[in-house]
UniProtKB/Swiss-Prot annotation:
Residues 90-139 are annotated as: Disordered. This is Nuclear transcription factor Y subunit B-4. PANTHER family: CCAAT-BINDING TRANSCRIPTION FACTOR-RELATED (PTHR11064), NUCLEAR TRANSCRIPTION FACTOR Y SUBUNIT B-4 (PTHR11064:SF83). Residues 35-46 are annotated as: Subunit association domain (SAD). Pfam families: CBFD_NFYB_HMF (PF00808). Expressed in flowers, siliques and young rosettes. Belongs to the NFYB/HAP3 subunit family. Keywords: Activator, DNA-binding, Nucleus, Transcription, Transcription regulation. Heterotrimeric transcription factor composed of three components, NF-YA, NF-YB and NF-YC. NF-YB and NF-YC must interact and dimerize for NF-YA association and DNA binding. It comes from Arabidopsis thaliana (Mouse-ear cress). PROSITE patterns: NFYB_HAP3 (PS00685). Residues 8-14 bind DNA. Component of the NF-Y/HAP transcription factor complex. The NF-Y complex stimulates the transcription of various genes by recognizing and binding to a CCAAT motif in promoters.
Length: 139
């Protein structure tokens, strides 16, 4: 694996820089490469700490809580606070989405059941009308 292979994609780094800086700002190739190297190193540093924690706990998957823990352990409290808030919001949104989907499925089934009942009722009424008509015309 070459050094370039381990770096974040330069296009993504440049796009993020453009989003953060004023629209009239110019970004040199050297600036993009420097941020690319720093951001890659930062991510590796934090991920390595989180990965070591997982290894000690005999786990193979690094999760958001591990990243939060690593940031806190490394003394990067501002980042840890931001990640903690993000994790909380993410989990809340997931919980709401799950509840909404569960509610939609339940009400969807209820609607389907109601529709079936309505069709059956309409069919029964139609049959009665037809039977009445038949018996009336038979007289």
């Amino acid at each position: 694996m070459t050094d370039e292979d381990r770096l974040l994609p330069i296009a993504n780094v440049g796009r993020l820089m453009k989003q953060i800086l004023p629209s009239n700002a110019k970004i040199s190739k050297e600036a993009k490469q420097t941020v690319q190297e720093c951001a890659t190193e930062f991510i590796s540093f934090v991920t390595c700490e989180a990965s070591e924690k997982c290894h000690r706990e005999n786990r193979k998957t690094v999760n958001g809580d591990d990243i939060w823990w690593a940031l806190s352990t490394l003394g990067l409290d501002n980042y840890a606070d931001a990640v903690g808030r993000h994790l909380h919001k993410y989990r809340e949104a997931e919980r709401e989405r799950t509840e909404h989907n569960k509610g939609s499925n339940d009400s969807g089934n209820e609607k389907e059941t109601n529709t079936r009942s309505d069709v059956q009722n309409q069919s029964t009424k139609f049959i009665r009308v037809v039977e009445k008509g038949s018996s009336s015309s038979a007289r």
